[in-house]
Amino acid sequence: MMNDLKSFLDEKAEQYNHPNFVLGDPIQMLHRFELKQDIEIIGFLTATIAWGNRKSIIKSAEKMLMMMGSSPYDFVMNFTEKDFEKLEDKAIHRTFSLEDFSFFLSALQKIYTKNESLENLFLLKEGETNFYHALERFRNTFFENDFQHRSQKHISSTYKKFCCEKADDVSPLDGAEG
């Protein structure tokens, strides 16, 4: 049983950790950057819109990257709402609108003003035994100034019964408040 699992995982690692796979996959967006914060930002934004076919996701991620220029981190840190005034009605990807994109950039700006990396929000704190708390902490931090914003639909809560539409068997934390 363990040998079968190991063989399967080795096969999948070889399949996915190959330059030919990366070229047709949204993960290619991350491989364009070296700065940790650039990688985090484009990775987070690309993952947020990662539903549908890969070509469509890549095209939409390219659209966001064109708006941000060569450094997503620099753009986030210097972003103002006026940067998007001329693009008001532009759609990004399916239900992820320019309004959502602008909200995400503002939220990321606030996070990076207080943290060197998104990683800081995902580290387990003392007494935590799983990542449910860290994921919910990230979500709460992300929406701390406007929790009713329409963009909250793009970041699931781990404290809700169905925290991820792609997961088949997800259960909430026992006794967690949500």
Locations of regions flagged by a protein language model:
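HhH-family (HhH-GPD) DNA N-glycosylase catalytic core used in base-excision repair
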Residues: 1-178
